[in-house]
Amino acid sequence: MNRREFSKAMAASASLLLPRVGLAASSARIEPATHPTRALHEFEKLQFGVSFHFSMNTFTGNDYETGGVPASTYNPTNLDVRQWIRTARDLGARYAVLTAKHMSGFALWDSANYDYDVAASPNKTDVVAEFVKACKEYKLKHGFYYCILDPHNEGKFDWDIPVKDDYYQLIKRQLTELHSRYPNTFYQLLDITWKLSQDQRWELYELIKKYSPHGILVMNQAYYQSRRNLGRICELKSWPTDVINAEDTMPPPEGHDPHVKFEGKTYYMPLEAWIPTGPPFKPLPPMNSWFWRPGFTTQSAEKIASEYNDCRQRHSNLLLNLSPDTSGRLPDEAVSNLHEAARIINRKS
């Protein structure tokens, strides 16, 4: 082999390696931001969102519904998602989050090859579709909540046992359904993420960013972690996340510093205080209820306005939870309180 032939052979061999090298260079892991990005700036600018806890739990009166009741139990008689979003708009909220699937396993959309969803119930309305449509009508950013804990699909209620592969594949499939149907979703909250491995959390983070590259992904820290750290740090089992979520916990008195250190690196992570407006939840007295149940009363307008103002002063978003009843509407007493809260907020601003 002469020098020219040798050079050609070496070039050909090198060309076989180039695609792999190029792929490795172009597939750097997407990770939480170290500085304010467009998405995070928009999130902070919105300041105020609402979440809606509405699912099978509403019809059993149990925040910890395990999905042991038939799909026919879910039967809203006067479902009006537009009323939810209109009320949120009137309150001053700028984004809204729906419990697409809570721990009961019941899905609020017709999920493919899945028999525990609205399509299997007496009221087959695709609540997710109606929610996204109403958000567009009233000009709120839309987002979804999805619970990893799921006794219906896991076979038992266990806060800590890692998810098995068959259920994890369902999680991926359902999140892909939601985000491929509604690309560029502004916000996704995953709850009870400590049941996932670190690799699984990264895979879901990257999956959602594929469809919503400028969206916000929140891995909830949950109640006890939030009360312990007040959003000053990010827990390992809530990583990766774009925002620190403080469940049923107000921001620290000194205010939130978004420059959060995690494993020796500083990230830019806003805080979101996620506050339920229901009465105390009896199985866990320090926490308030998320879902409507008989006898449910909403926080006073003064308390809601105070929570809003405290979050503003402490450099945190407020995600205020609202609870539609079994009719599928926000109760009149809740709407009245929320309208009064809006008047107080506007008067003080």
Enumerate the predicted regions with their spans.
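Mature catalytic domains of secreted/periplasmic carbohydrate-active enzymes
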Residues: 7-17, 25-349
